[in-house]
Curated annotation (Swiss-Prot):
Residues 34-56 are annotated as: Disordered. The lineage of its organism: Eukaryota, Fungi, Dikarya, Ascomycota, Taphrinomycotina. Residues 39-52 have a biased composition (Polar residues). Belongs to the ATP25 family. The keyword Transcription regulation does not apply. This is ATPase synthesis protein 25, mitochondrial. Residues 1-28 form a transit peptide. It comes from Schizosaccharomyces pombe (strain 972 / ATCC 24843). Pfam families: RsfS (PF02410). InterPro entries: Atp25, NT_sf.
């Protein structure tokens, strides 16, 4: 008698399939509409039955407009009209942003012809919901522009692949730190600059766009940069000169007159001794000035002004500038303007190192820099863009006052930085290094590292000059914590950078100073830094 083996596994599968087919109550099990979604047709025909849906389509296909209203919402987004004379590829850019990346609030902005906060003739703004959508839309635009052969496209705001690897490696080493502490957050603003057509495309999150008020940027005037920087209740009399006027006169006597009258009034109230010495120095400085020795004369005056602040004033510096400006035989160059700006921005104080007195000096510097800038705009000696960048650089420089043992930093330096960011004014490398120097000397190292990381996020490739500058700042600070941070994180960034930083004797000297300034307990620490220094020194000797 034959024997049969019972297949329990097959039996279990058959049982499960049977019970599923009989008792499955899921909406997809039967190809009919669920009762709650069946339309009420009782008014038309009481005996009518709901129609069965085709077996090839599930029930939710006919209800897609009710279930997925998001697509219908984005289809309703209107595209802005393309300006006259614009290139044809802008239509494809708008369609790509709308249909594929669901960008909203698409709009064009025409930058004024005399504006210095933008090099582009036309600006396109697009908003996304989050930082990841900003990155996706930017990468998609890069691929489209490459297909259109529009020429070189500069991208700002995207994090490079090598930088992401460094941050991920630090995250694995320090699991107790969050993404925010390691600055691994998403990109909230990117900019694509098409050089051949003078077009900039800004892809930004909605929160950032609302905060920076980019839609009103075409109505911005340049006067915003140098007017009302004080935003306080301080009288304009204290901003005019360090000399005190006659107290017998009422305060409104000075306030009700023009700036020229107030400057003349304060100048006439100098003491007889100061006026006599000032007159002698004036005759020595401005004697036989011509176009050949103008630069050397201004440099000589700058040296005298910085070394003898009791004999000179900002009023006198402005009067020298006005005399040179009105002389048709003399022509001020960029170097001469730089010397005059630096003389005002670095003017020392005759008062004690009190916070109130230092703040008044910063206000005076800003006022006289603004007055000189207004005169240079009318003079048109250099182009407007270079002049305004130079003006902003020395406005930042004027916010720091050097004392006998410490530095005073005015908080208006952060207001200037916000103005530059809000109006899209580019910060040059020289201005960035100046900002880092001022913050480091004022012991604001958290602000130094935050700006360093922001520059890294913008995709800027650091060179030897930037790294050497931060090494020297750390060495001069004599701060053990700062030097440790530089020899770990900053050095790791430099070694991992592609293309690599070329070996130089200056770099080896700066790193060696940082290592030697540490206490003896770090004698065997930082082996990678020590090996790098030895390798660079050996390569320079052979």
């Amino acid at each position: 008698m034959p024997t049969y083996r019972f297949n329990y596994l097959r039996f279990n599968k058959l049982c499960v399939s049977f019970f599923r087919s009989k008792f499955d109550k899921r909406p997809f099990a039967s190809q009919k509409f669920p009762e709650n979604l069946v339309p009420d047709n009782s008014s038309n025909d009481a005996n009518s039955q709901p129609e069965e849906v085709s077996s090839k389509k599930p029930w939710y296909v006919d209800e897609k407009h009710n279930l997925f209203p998001k697509k219908a919402h984005f289809d309703a987004v209107a595209l802005p009209p393309i300006p006259k004379g614009a290139p044809n590829f802008l239509a494809d850019v708008l369609n790509l942003l709308k249909k594929k990346y669901y960008a909203t609030d698409l709009s064009f902005v025409n930058s004024p012809a005399d504006s210095f906060w933008c090099d582009s003739d036309l600006i396109l703004l697009a908003s996304c919901n989050c930082g990841s959508e900003v990155v996706s839309a930017t990468n998609g635009l890069l691929r489209l522009l490459k297909q259109k052969n529009v020429g070189p496209v500069n991208v700002d705001g995207l994090t490079s692949a090598s930088r992401r690897k460094i941050l991920e490696r630090r995250m694995r080493k320090r699991s107790n730190l969050s993404n925010r502490q390691l600055n691994t957050s998403e990109n909230n603003w990117t900019c694509l600059s098409i050089e051949n057509f003078g077009i900039s495309i800004h892809v930004i999150t909605k929160n950032f766009r609302e905060y920076y008020k980019l839609d009103n940027i075409e109505h911005v005037k340049d006067e915003t940069l140098y007017s009302d920087l004080e935003h306080g209740k301080q009288s304009r009399v204290s901003l005019t000169s360090k000399s005190t006027p006659d107290n017998s006169l009422p305060p409104n006597f000075i306030n009700n007159h023009s700036n020229v009258f107030r400057r003349s009034f304060h100048t006439c109230n100098f003491s007889l001794k100061s006026a006599a010495s000032l007159y002698c120095d004036t005759q020595d400085i401005l004697l036989n000035v011509n176009s050949q020795n103008l630069t050397s004369t201004l440099e000589k005056y700058k040296k005298m002004h910085l070394q003898n602040p009791n004999n000179f004033s900002l009023d006198f510096t402005l009067s020298i500038f006005e005399r040179l400006r009105k002389d048709s035989s003399l022509q001020l160059t960029t170097k001469d303007i730089n010397t005059l700006f630096s003389t005002i921005a670095l003017s020392p104080t005759k008062l004690s190192m009190a916070s109130k007195h230092s703040k008044n000096l910063v206000s005076e510097r800003m006022l006289y820099l603004s007055l000189m800038y207004k005169s240079l705009v009318d003079l048109k000696t250099i182009d407007s863009f270079s002049l305004k960048l130079l003006f902003l650089k020395f406005m930042i420089c004027s916010c720091m006052v050097k004392g006998e043992s410490n530095f005073f930093l005015d908080n208006r330096i952060f207001l200037l930085e916000r103005i530059m960011n809000r109006y899209g004014i580019p910060m040059t490398i020289d201005t960035f290094l100046l900002m880092q120097f001022i913050l480091a000397k004022s012991n604001r190292w958290s602000e130094v590292w935050r700006r360093w990381d922001n520059l890294r996020k913008a995709g800027v490739v650091f060179n030897e000059r930037l790294y050497n500058h931060v090494y020297l700042l750390a060495f001069e600070s004599k701060n053990e914590r700062v030097i440790n941070y530089v020899l770990t994180n900053i050095f790791e960034d430099m070694v991992s950078q592609s293309p690599p930083i070329p070996a130089s004797k200056l770099m080896a000297t700066s790193l060696k100073k940082c290592v030697q300034s540490l206490p003896e307990k770090y004698a065997h620490s930082f082996p990678s830094v020590r090996n790098y220094i030895a390798k660079m020194e050996n390569s320079m000797t052979h």
